Amino acid sequence: SDVYKRQEEYIDGGWSDNMPLGLAARMGAEELLAVDVDGVGVTLPNLTGLPTTCVRSYWDLGPILRFEPATAKRNIALGYQDCYRAFGRLAGTAYALRAGEDKKLAERFVRPYARLLRSAISRSPSLALTEGAALRPMERWCTTEQARALAPLERAAELAGVDPVGIYTADELCDAFLQKSDGEAAARFYPLLRQEAGWRPMEAAVSAAVPGEFLTALVRFVLTGQ
């Protein structure tokens, strides 16, 4: 990790202290910018008491000592997006969303998704657990209400294989998900989501076995206006 004080550069080799924030504090830093690459070694807790901005990536950056041009290019792009996100210039957790897209996201996804999920759970309560299981990989990352509201769309996009490199508008991320996800596979869960369906124990049991596929169906159902 590189830690900067004024115009001088101090280098720590990692392993025993992957983010040497204490070193920066001892050098006289008054504010810290930390980059956590989730590398091999020990990451000590931040006990400096200094204002700290930490840049982290949701995505697996690959083996830290494997130097491949394609991986390096991808990681540089992700790092650029993560840094902008850390300073509030971009939204999203797994995907980089343009700032100012809140209204569009609420109209196209957040509100209709919440309505659909409430309706489905009222008929089949176990679906709440199924959705929770699908979103579990994002839990520790979603620390704000906005992040939690967007988590189903972002997780579904991840499961569909949408490229995280790139800055998306609300419509672009929704459309990228629709292009990548399997509509035919999602359709088998639609009976659970239709108002007239009633309680469907068989479909609910299947969804519990494949929560990611159920989440994909939920998101597709909303975005295609089924």
Can you annotate each of these PLM segments?
Residues 1, 5-226:
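Patatin-like phospholipase
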